[in-house]
Amino acid sequence: MRKVTIFIIIIVALTGFGSVRIKDIADFRGARDNQLFGIGVVVGLNGTGDSGQVNSTLLANMAKAFNVSIDSDSLKTKNSALVMVFADIPPFYKEGMRLDVSVASIGDAKSLEGGFLVQTPLYGADGNVYAVAQGNVSVGGFDVKVSANLQNKYRIVGYIPNGAIVEKEIPFEFVQSNSVTILLKKPDFTTSARVAQAINTTFERKIAKAVDASSIKIEVPSAFEDDIVTFLSLVEEVEVSVDQPARVVVNEKTGTVVFGGNVKILDFTLSYGVFNITVKNGKVESSEEVDATVSSLVSALKNLGATPQDIIAILQTMHSAGVLLADLVVM
């Protein structure tokens, strides 16, 4: 049988390609997710719960709060499990809105399947309760292709869609001293300067200033002092050309190479096995001389019959020699 090698090359124009909205590359300072956590009990397990004393003692104390006296020793039935409970609360969430919840076993429970999380307060980093979680725990479906051991491994982690109710809004201020700050998701000095320039051009006045590679400070115009929401929505829709550093990403296991369409290379002569390629005066010397980029080099190597492993090895050597003008990320 003929062995076929599949070589995947993905060319991504990472440098100066098109425009994107500010809302796609940045967030307003102060408007961020917050992590919540708590410790709770999952009940209703069919003998797959914890076997330890801690869980039964906790359940006995919970019953005591409802004036029900139960000996903790009588609760060692493995029908409950002590769990950590997690949720992320997005910005602007108000009381009564719902959050997705994740639960994970703390003890020696075998499975949380079929269990029910008893009402559990969820705390923020400041120690205050911001949400309460409760509901049926889902551990996902059964995959006949996966071994029983692997199935059991992931049945001690569960999920409760919309399982928590927000009880307290997390306070924040994103307008300070009549100004707001936007933070780039990927810091870059060039992009930061372009964002400030684009905002100033859109509003026809100098209200934005790039503070550093990640933050741009914007003064709120007097016309919008009583309508901040409209002003922020206009800022979000401003389009800007994004600049990204040159990068080549290779995956040795799959033979995948991802690189920007304009990643440049310096002059060099390559001799690798039966392959010989020369880059001179910024051109790849082949049947048709083309500009010296990673894209043109890879195309030339493919035409010579290079395998994915050959090309990855050549790129790594070029990076070590300093002729590849990009960061090389090997996965």
Swiss-Prot record:
GO biological process: bacterial-type flagellum-dependent cell motility
Compartments where found: Periplasm; Bacterial flagellum basal body
InterPro entries hit by this protein: Flag_FlgI (IPR001782)
Signal peptide boundaries: 1-22
Pfam family, one: FlgI
A GO cellular-component term linked to this record: bacterial-type flagellum basal body, distal rod, P ring
GO molecular function: structural molecule activity
Highest taxon of source: Bacteria
Keyword GTP-binding applies: no
Keywords: Bacterial flagellum, Periplasm, Signal
HAMAP family, A to Z: FlgI
NCBIfam families tied to this protein: PRK05303.1
Assembly description: The basal body constitutes a major portion of the flagellar organelle and consists of four rings (L,P,S, and M) mounted on a central rod.
Its job: Assembles around the rod to form the L-ring and probably protects the motor/basal body from shearing forces during rotation.
Family: Belongs to the FlgI family.
Name of the protein in its database record: Flagellar P-ring protein
Organismal lineage: Bacteria, Thermotogati, Thermotogota, Thermotogae, Thermotogales
